Design a protein with these regions (language model features):
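Pepsin/retropepsin-fold aspartyl endopeptidases
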Residues: 1-161
């Protein structure tokens, strides 16, 4: 079982504008449990593209939030467009801030940097995540395969897949 153990870090500004390092516990509180990921087209769709003689879009890397509040994994819509992901369906997204909103559904695969595993996520919802500095929200549909330990006091997370 692969294990990833990280301690978050970051920087903040003092009232006079000086940049200072943040204690790990504060960095984890402010940013949440984030990991670096590589995202690409789901394997079955990628194989079909190759069989047709089409080039595969290059994977993209960025940050993902391990989000126990999200029922589904979500990808930033702009990232989905840059990866030229096909829209395979339209679903309804609900959140604490808005009622049902139409959302494109994309087939992706992703890996958490540091893990030797490609995770297939065939029904990933599109969302506006760029403003939060995120590429993905890893929701409960994928976290069901994981053990996550969140140690707020030390600013550390441990993820087992």
């Amino acid at each position: 079982m692969p294990i990833l153990h990280i301690q978050l870090g970051g920087q903040g500004k003092t009232p006079d504008g000086k940049i200072v390092p943040l204690p790990p516990a504060i960095a984890l509180q402010q940013r949440g449990p984030v990991v670096q990921v590589s995202v690409s087209l789901q394997e079955s769709y990628a194989k079909a593209l190759v069989q047709q003689g089409n080039p595969l879009p290059q994977p993209m890397t960025g940050f993902a939030l391990l989000d126990t509040g999200a029922s589904n994994t979500c990808i930033d819509d702009e990232v989905a467009q840059q990866l030229q992901l096909p829209v395979i369906d339209v679903g309804s997204m609900c959140s604490a801030s808005h009622a049902k909103t139409p959302s494109n559904i994309y087939p992706i695969q992703f890996s958490v940097i540091g893990f030797p595993i490609q995770l297939q996520c065939p029904r990933t919802m599109g969302a506006a995540l760029k403003e939060q500095g995120l590429m993905l929200l890893i929701g409960r549909d994928m976290l069901v395969y994981c053990t996550l330990f969140y140690n707020g006091g030390t600013g550390q997370i441990t993820l087992c897949i």
